[in-house]
Amino acid sequence: MELEYESKRPLYIPHAGPILLEFPLLNKGSAFSLEERDNFNLQGLLPDTVETIEEQAERAWRQYQDFRTNIDRHIYLRNIQDTNETLFYRLLAAHLAEMLPIIYTPTVGDACERFSDIYRRARGVFISYNNCDKIEDMLQNATKQNVKVIVVTDGERILGLGDQGIGGMGIPIGKLSLYTACGGISPAYTLPVVLDAGTNNQQLLNDPLYMGWRHPRITGEQYDKFVDAFIQAVKRRWPNVLLQFEDFAQKNATPLLNRYRSELCCFNDDIQGTAAVTLGCLLAASRAAGKRLRDQKVVFLGAGSAGCGIAEQITAEMRTEGLSEDEARRRVLMVDRFGLLTDKLANLLDFQSRLVQPSDSLSDWQLDSDTISLQDVVRNARPTVLIGVSGQPGLFTEEIIRDMHQHCERPIVMPLSNPTSRVEATPEDLLRWTDGAALVATGSPFAPVQFEGKTYPIAQCNNAYIFPGIGLGVLASGAGQITDAMLIAASRALADCSPLANGDGGALLPDINDIQSVSRVIAMAVAKAAQVHGVALVTSEETLSLAIEHNFWQPQYRDYRRTSF
């Protein structure tokens, strides 16, 4: 049970003078009091006026508004983060809906592609295969000692952009910013890490300013040993840490998760987080449409690790509603670039083979060729839910959506591919093609749609609704693992927060400005599930609630007292 918190008591620190101003976690800038300026040798190093954090945030907001491009806004916010983290999170708290797409998707994709060009200051730990014998030392060198949450990537599959090498570091930095802004986890407890296993991106290898290891990606046994060396070093350094795998290639993501999820508290947000938030959104949409999940027929476009992870979560929840495993799997169909996954297809990956449809069940389908397209599936299977995780734009065509709407009064359509340029269909088109009947959730942010005099808010099926609450629940409960039951509990808790499902109108998911409240609800559900399933000590609900609040950091300055090393 984790009851420690960044308390309101004075903080005793040994740093002073210019060195103190260089610590983002400790720096207050112009908000240092007159007494602190005397005690910490800051006189003359700051303007005369002592400001409040509200005044600092107002200045930062005005400066932010002067920037004309999202990438420049991203760079500006990252500069504040690297200068004064408390101010950074106070600014985010005041303008979360505006700034969330800037610090994370979709703008973070541009930042990853241009990482070496826009690099200003080091943050986190860069572990190169070239120096893999020094991993222990690298973790010891981390400026944060009491790390509780690590987000790690190898940069091979960054969003829909592919191999970005060490540019992938932008993802752990952004993800951990959301752990704090949305889930209240103190930035003092978080650490972004990139495993630099080389890159196969020739453009990066040819770039004279690329800052990573200039070498083709290592694979096979070399790669496995590299990742394992990192995991074992983390276990020795921080044995109770929560480790999140982020943007690993499909061929590595699931094997790494399966290998290590019982060895330390870890999860893969691309697989499990995406699945949890999608299931939560689908549960909410099903309630809004007046159906149980078990009665839906779901078609996926995209059968990678993310799509299959979502499908597994959906079938698991269908089973809790009374379906057998075979019945649940018959109601979830997977389509990839080779067509519908059936037992006749060769060379399927392990996680795909569990989701194939038996060929004999398709004997009455009207087909023109051996390859069963998305159009064929929609016409023959008559789905009520269509989920896109293909990374390919425009594949939910007008013909497909209109065919779906012919047999489904309120189709649920979720084009989840990121960034916006890769979305399978826009919300405006989906609503127009269904005469406003579609229940829509997207992976990227979209403005509300005006259709025939009515405003339709568009839910962003953003993992930020889920993983911060999961992290908070793990820390508060002291869970040693993240189980499937904990993830399903998170999905149900998110659905319970849906304005539309609760009959209040609006979007399928809560307003992003309410995300801290949502994270608390999810944290409680996750912590309870951890206790029920034996991966956390059993305590009262009151104790859990207290632990969640004690772990919920707020961006406020603490009083400082001088001490010696």
Swiss-Prot record:
Entry GO terms, CC: cytosol
Binding-site positions, a divalent metal cation: 246-247, 270
Cofactor note: Divalent metal cations. Prefers magnesium or manganese.
SUPFAM superfamilies: Aminoacid dehydrogenase-like, N-terminal domain, NAD(P)-binding Rossmann-fold domains
Keyword vocabulary terms for this entry: Metal-binding, NAD, Oxidoreductase
MF terms in GO: malate dehydrogenase (decarboxylating) (NAD+) activity; metal ion binding; NAD binding; oxaloacetate decarboxylase activity
Catalytic activity: (S)-malate + NAD(+) = pyruvate + CO2 + NADH; oxaloacetate + H(+) = pyruvate + CO2
Residues holding NAD(+): 157, 270, 418
CDD domains: NAD_bind_1_malic_enz
Residues at the site labelled Important for activity: 270
UniProt-listed Enzyme Commission number(s): 1.1.1.38
Catalytic residue list: 104, 175
Gene Ontology biological process: malate metabolic process
Cofactor list: Mg(2+); Mn(2+)
Family: Belongs to the malic enzymes family.
Binding partners and assembly: Homotetramer.
Protein name, as recorded: NAD-dependent malic enzyme
Protein encoded by which gene: maeA
